[in-house]
Amino acid sequence: MSCPLRPSEAQEGDQLSEECGMLYGEYLMLDKILEAQRLLSEQNNQPVHDEHLFIVTHQAYELWFKQIIYELDSIRNIFSDVLEESQTLEILKRLNRVVLILKVLVDQVMILETMTPLDFMDFRCYLRPASGFQSLQFRLLENKLGVRQENRVKYNQNYSKVFGNDEKALEQIAKSEKEPSLTDLVQRWLERTPGLELEGFNFWGKYQKAVEKLLTEQKELAEKEEAETLKRYKLNDLEKRREVYESIFKVEVHEALMSRGERRFSHKALQGAIMITFYRDEPRFSQPHQILTLLMDIDSLITKWRYNHVLMVQRMIGSSQLGTGGSSGYQYLRSTLSDRYKVFVDLFNLSTFLIPRSYIPPLSTSMRSHLCNWGSANSTNIVSNGNN
């Protein structure tokens, strides 16, 4: 790399030397990276041109996976401690970086699609038994985000078995399963949202009353409908909506949904997410709301990447052939598009529980002051307890 202390007149290419340190290629270890494209098709002295593209694209994926894991680990470390408000901007920056990387990965599939099925068939036989299912980094990425083992689609065997006797890989998998995932840490953070305290602002109690008022008033309007068919439709719709709201108001119903994997966040964390969504315009909830939005973006982009991957696989090998690693190929990949693999599915479903702005419980003077106050002695972070 060029030395920042070198005089400007010494920046010319013919004057580069090692007196100030290593050069560009040495710093990036390009000799190793650029020599890592070994075409198996060359073994028969019949190199397949597109195998080079296949290797480079997947190596690029793995490098980006490494960067995403690096960012996620740093974010999880910040969340592991009491989260200071001054750190939320850093979390936003790193989450946004992950989002932008994932957008690159989604678009990168298009490069592979420049290869035709016949082009792929020319070297596919050399890939067995290697498979994308064996990507250790992608499994670590999933675990660190919060994909649970019980939610994974079965792949003939436990997903970690594909790493065979690779003790280092198995240790990393085991560690990623045991340590708190980003989902776990976000849940703990949401559970400490100021304003949920029963003896304080008691947002949840106020929210339940607001929902009851909304449903009661809408029922009264429905009963005034003269057309019997329309009246019956509106009353039935209101009854269904009441059941939906009761699924979050009744703890036992919420926990039953959690046990079935239909909800992931604890009851208290869900309350915090709803409160942040309602009062996102308040200064101290602005950045937390952006965090929740970026978490959904990450989930969305991973789903889009899976979907693009599914379509590419179907285009290359059809929907009935087995994958090179022995999986059902297209059928297996398509099954990973379900909500089972969405770690922040509860955030997507928050819109189900929204109410019109006019019904949102107004903040008390003390609570509004608390949410507008940055850095008071008793309220230095978003996860501290609000007393009013």
UniProtKB/Swiss-Prot annotation:
The keyword Metal-binding applies. Coiled coil: none annotated. It holds the Pfam family Trp_dioxygenase. Its cofactor is heme. Heme binds at residue 309. It is an enzyme of class 1 (oxidoreductase). SUPFAM superfamilies: Indolic compounds 2,3-dioxygenase-like. The keyword Oxidoreductase applies. GO terms for biological process: L-tryptophan catabolic process to kynurenine; ommochrome biosynthetic process. Keywords: Dioxygenase, Heme, Iron, Metal-binding, Oxidoreductase, Tryptophan catabolism. Substrate binds at residues 54-58, 124, 324. One of its GO terms (molecular function) is metal ion binding. Binds 1 heme group per subunit. Pathway: Amino-acid degradation; L-tryptophan degradation via kynurenine pathway; L-kynurenine from L-tryptophan: step 1/2; Pigment biosynthesis; ommochrome biosynthesis. It catalyses: L-tryptophan + O2 = N-formyl-L-kynurenine. Its EC number is 1.13.11.11. Homotetramer. Dimer of dimers. Heme-dependent dioxygenase that catalyzes the oxidative cleavage of the L-tryptophan (L-Trp) pyrrole ring and converts L-tryptophan to N-formyl-L-kynurenine. Catalyzes the oxidative cleavage of the indole moiety. Required for normal eye pigmentation. Belongs to the tryptophan 2,3-dioxygenase family. HAMAP family: T23O (MF_01972). This is Tryptophan 2,3-dioxygenase. It comes from Tribolium castaneum (Red flour beetle).
